[in-house]
Amino acid sequence: MKELLSIHSAPAQHWVGDGFPVHSVFGYTGAEVAQRSPFLLLDYVAPCEFAVNLGQRRGVGAHPHRGFETVTIVFDGEVEHRDSTGAGGVIGPGDVQWMTAGGGIVHEEFHSTAYSRQGGLFEMVQLWVNLPAQAKMTPAGYQGIAAERIPNVRLTGGTGKVRLIAGEFAGFSGPARTHTPMNVWDVRVDSEQSVRLDQPAGWTTLIVVLSGTLTVNDSATLSAKEMATLSTRGAGVRIEASRASRWLLLAGEPIAEQIGRASCRERVYSGV
């Protein structure tokens, strides 16, 4: 079994722009950053309600990224994206956007026009994934992954399923193209049960709880907006859910390289 290394609880909510009240479950600073490689950051917008908005749409205006990828997973609501490559679109419930910043990209993210006009429930995750040195300057790109393209794989002997965004599970493959080997799974169970979700030895493994209560490898119990970091040693991952629960399983081959941060916006924009 993989050893439980740590449990982390997300700090208090803060706003990204005026459209995204996020809990930053983890980021790319601190002593444990190497234990989370290749994953850099995860922001979670827990279920919330937005009122009808007929004025300026809520969101985040144009801003640059470079050297990594952003993965936006929408559960409820809609996000509209545009970027400097000319790509864009609306990400609705169940959809995923996998954007490669690579050598540099400028993009903006707002509530869609349709969602703004009707308001309602909103929930999403944004995950940042590091790129290895040889891919840092790869051309910027955009993968728009509609919900119907994502396999929903039933868990053996249970009432849950794995939405396979990236990687492999039970003979199925996720649609996202990745630069390093990884699994990005959206897992949901409908009742109390125990499941095995083993990951390759040598891989980073993170369990991020979105709802419900989980016990990980008989070691610790987690609730919503908490994350377990497991060791790269071993392969076993056992999850016991005490009730209906949802979590993200993030696993991947670590990138054994130092993480650099741009010293100024001009340096980031220079790659665009």
Segments the model singles out, each with a brief description of its role:
Residues 1-265:
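Jelly-roll (double-stranded beta-helix
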